[in-house]
Structure formats: C-alpha cells, structure tokens
Regions:
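Anionic group-transfer/hydrolysis microenvironments
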Residues: 16-17, 47, 76
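Charged helix-capping and loop-helix junction motifs
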Residues: 24-31, 55-58, 83-88
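Class I SAM-dependent methyltransferase SAM-binding "motif I" and its flanking Rossmann-like core
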Residues: 50
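C-terminal lobe/tail of nucleotide-utilizing enzymes
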Residues: 59-127
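Phosphate-binding/switch loop-helix module in NTP-utilizing enzymes
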Residues: 1-23, 30
Length: 127
C-alpha cells in the first residue's frame, strides 16, 4: 500500500464510532488509518460538546502525522444548536489550515455542500 499511486488508488473507508474505537489488541481505528497511510475526512455532529470532541481528535490526528482533507459538520434532525455558530467557532479555532464544510439536514447529494466536499477530495488527490 505504501508504494501506491494516489491517482489510481482511491478507496473509501468508514470508521464508524470514532477514531479512538478499539479494534484489536490495544489498536484503534486511528492506528489502522496510520498503518494504511490514508487521508481522513472527519464527520462531526452539531451538539453540545462537539467542538471539544472535534478539536481533541484533530490533536490526535496531528500527533499521528496524518493528512486531514476536511471536516464535515453534520446537522442533526433534532438540532437545538445553531450550526452556523458551531461552524464559525470551528473555523476560528482551526484557522485556515483545515477546511470545514457543513451539511444541512435537508441536503442531498446534488447540493452545493456535497459538491464542495467532493471538490476538496478531488483537489487533495490532484485528479
């Protein structure tokens, strides 16, 4: 896997439950991502505590020297928090080093939000 051509080796891997979920013998999903040497797209919810959780996982990603393509802020059906406020706080905390995209609860795959996310991934792989 280490000697692959990025343009010919794009795979999607979903790590449900978070990057620190144990998978075997003290290994986590984050360890697997490091071993596979794959970039990340992180999907986070818009809930009380999501900012802290997101910043914590980014610190772990940085400590593992992994590439992060972007963060997707996902609006929940029962959102009581303003997703725009969460987006602003994330962007202020991260600066311009990491792209933050949001997906509204009524978005579909043809929406501008999904196009932006796909564009980020294509740009990362120089396609």
């Amino acid at each position: 896997i280490k000697n692959r051509n990025k343009k010919n080796f794009i795979k999607i891997f979903e790590g449900a439950g978070g990057l620190l979920v144990p998978i075997e013998n003290k290994k986590t999903t984050l360890d697997l991502v490091k071993d596979l040497d794959i970039p990340l797209v992180i999907v986070v919810g818009n809930y009380l505590g999501s900012l802290s959780h997101t910043l914590s996982i980014i610190k772990n990603i940085e400590n593992y020297n992994l590439d992060l393509i972007n963060i997707i802020l996902n609006q929940n059906q029962d959102d009581s928090l303003n997703i725009n406020d969460t987006e602003i706080l994330l962007k202020q905390s991260l600066g311009k080093k990491i792209l933050v995209r949001k997906i509204l609860k009524n978005s579909n795959y043809k929406s501008k939000e999904f196009s932006s996310i796909l564009s980020d991934i294509i740009k990362y792989f120089n396609l």
